[in-house]
Regions:
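Structural/interface elements that position substrates and couple domains in central-metabolism enzymes
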Residues: 1-233
Length: 233
């Protein structure tokens, strides 16, 4: 039974790693990965996975390392495929912050001293759970780089997460923001209006790690928008 669980979860982790690395390549090539995936999933045997800022939760990351350690009992070689998948998924928080820095460069603003709002800290949508959330790594990187960090998550209002007191409402704070990172695809965030963000934010930079905003509407609204695997618009 444990072998079955490890196999299914490591399979998912590897598929996410594949699409994350594909996203990094497509960004440089100017190809929108979401357009590609929407077309690819029309093929009956294609199992769609989506790129993001990383993989979290109590199962997938842990199970991949369990599989790596299990394999060491039977071979002198490392389980390179699984190890490389973990490396890819674990570098996605860094890439997310790189996208933010790239967007800030457009307005000649350093990340240090910038006010950045992180929307969503749960490792998956519509749950109150931050176990091994990749958003924690994003926040750690932002701290290291001297950003002023604000957090809003509808499941963690007026609490403390990752050493930061969370907001009970994010709209009233938009006017001080130099950037915004969508970290979790909570249903509440799917209805965010790009034009509203443009009208309220001090600097309208949006890093959409879940690709939930229509990038064409973002461009039309005048946002400085970056998605995972979407390139510049």
């Amino acid at each position: 039974a444990n072998a079955v669980k490890l196999t299914t979860n490591v399979f998912r982790d590897l598929n996410i790693a594949f699409v994350n690395e594909l996203a990094l390549i497509f960004e440089k090539a100017g190809i929108d990965i979401m357009t590609v995936l929407e077309a690819a999933k029309t093929k009956y045997n294609f199992q769609v996975h989506y790129p993001s800022a990383g993989v979290g939760g109590p199962c997938l990351p842990v199970n991949s390392y369990q599989m790596i350690n299990f394999a060491k009992n039977f071979t002198s070689k490392t389980f390179e495929l699984v190890e490389n998948g973990r490396k890819i998924n674990e570098k996605m928080p860094y890439h997310t912050v790189n996208l933010l820095e790239d967007a800030l460069n457009e307005i000649n603003k350093p990340l240090s001293g910038s006010s950045i709002l992180v929307l969503g800290v749960s490792y998956k949508p519509d749950v109150k759970d931050i176990q091994i959330s990749p958003i924690e790594k994003i926040i750690d990187i932002l701290k290291e780089k001297g950003a002023n960090i604000l957090i809003y998550d509808p499941y963690f209002k007026n609490s403390e997460v990752f050493g930061i007191k969370t907001l009970d409402d994010f709209v009233q704070n938009l006017g001080i923001l130099d950037g915004l990172i969508i970290g979790t695809a909570h249903k509440e965030f799917h209805n965010i209006d790009p034009e509203f963000l443009k009208s309220k934010m001090k600097n309208p930079i949006v890093i959409d790690s879940k690709n939930i905003i229509d990038q064409h509407l973002a461009k039309k609204a005048g946002l400085i928008y970056r998605g995972i695997g979407r390139g510049k618009i």
